[in-house]
């Protein structure tokens, strides 16, 4: 009888705690999202309210317990928040997107140490709600998942792996878990387009072997099919690098069955070099891609490179290796992504810089980004506009996370700036 009495009471307490969790994440996340939606200038008032409803109803419950109840912090982004905002800027329009680590109630508990089952459950829930195909996600999750015991073993092996990959002189972080799955929403008017990201590192830490072959074998069996030559181009390039296990994350567009032929796969990799010659090597895929679009994009990027690596005075040559902030840092200096589409001959390559590792302060980063915007004739470079937008969206530093760059003839310079809301004191 005692258990019967306690059952409803526990249930009521669980409901109350979950409501408190959502109130907390509402305070952390919603003001920044609303602020950037307004600043983008691309959304009507009705669009903004629709996007805020989607955020509250679909995303906030998936962020898991608030920090005081969570089994451990999120390590996906700087500052411990499992949610990151970004804004895509071009000369024609700006767009907001966000990404969150899939945690839910059970993620990082003993039942689901790396939130792998939680990721699968979330994918199933989103696919049912938005009518998405799971053909690609099922293949990737099955290829990269571990059992509960294997996941726990991977967690136990993490300290050794971190020491091996840490910058010399960096502070050793006390990491208790590892991100596995995260989801992104690109906000398009009142709708969203969805991406799923899955990290390879848990499997690699557990097995001690690269998971790249597993990924490339999976891609070769996807339908609609990718061109084997495009997959080979990426695989051969990566196998010729000095970096050990450079492939970090795979992402897929989540679409309905009828639009799989238009969906993309993106492969995210790290580089331990940050010279501009390294950028050239990656963007041309080892010198194999030298079309007019790629070369023009490189020329424009070179003209702004000193601003992105926070060297406004300029750099002497393309061999320069720029020192980075060392605290809690792996040996990763830059990131690149390869984008594949079914039937596409040549992958597209995008450059990513972890700005928090380069900028001595947010104020200097703001000055440098405003200078870069002026070079692109973007209005955010004028009269301190960029600085005001991000100070309004994020009440406390650090503001800057990462920067992404790609050029295409249709859209011109396409930059994405990533920012993470700070965690707040709990009520």
Swiss-Prot record:
Indole diterpene prenyltransferase; part of the gene cluster that mediates the biosynthesis of paspalitrems, indole-diterpene (IDT) mycotoxins that are potent tremorgens in mammals. The geranylgeranyl diphosphate (GGPP) synthase idtG is proposed to catalyze the first step in IDT biosynthesis via catalysis of a series of iterative condensations of isopentenyl diphosphate (IPP) with dimethylallyl diphosphate (DMAPP), geranyl diphosphate (GPP), and farnesyl diphosphate (FPP), to form GGPP. Disruption phenotype: Abolishes the production of all prenylated paspalitrems, but accumulates paspalinine and small quantities of paspaline. Simultaneous disruption of idtB, idtC, idtF and idtG eliminates the biosynthesis of the whole spectrum of indole-diterpenes reported to be produced by C.paspali, including paspaline, paxilline, paspalinine, paspalitrem A and paspalitrem B. Substrate binds at residues 97, 195, 264, 266, 268, 352. Pfam families: Trp_DMAT. Keywords: Transferase. Belongs to the tryptophan dimethylallyltransferase family. It comes from the Eukaryota. CDD domains: PT-DMATS_CymD. The gene is idtF. The keyword Lyase does not apply. One of its GO terms (biological process) is alkaloid metabolic process. The keyword Ribonucleoprotein does not apply. The lineage of its organism: Eukaryota, Fungi, Dikarya, Ascomycota, Pezizomycotina. Disulfide bonds: none annotated. This is Indole diterpene prenyltransferase idtF. Pathway: Secondary metabolite biosynthesis. Its EC number is 2.5.1.-. GO terms for molecular function: transferase activity, transferring alkyl or aryl (other than methyl) groups.
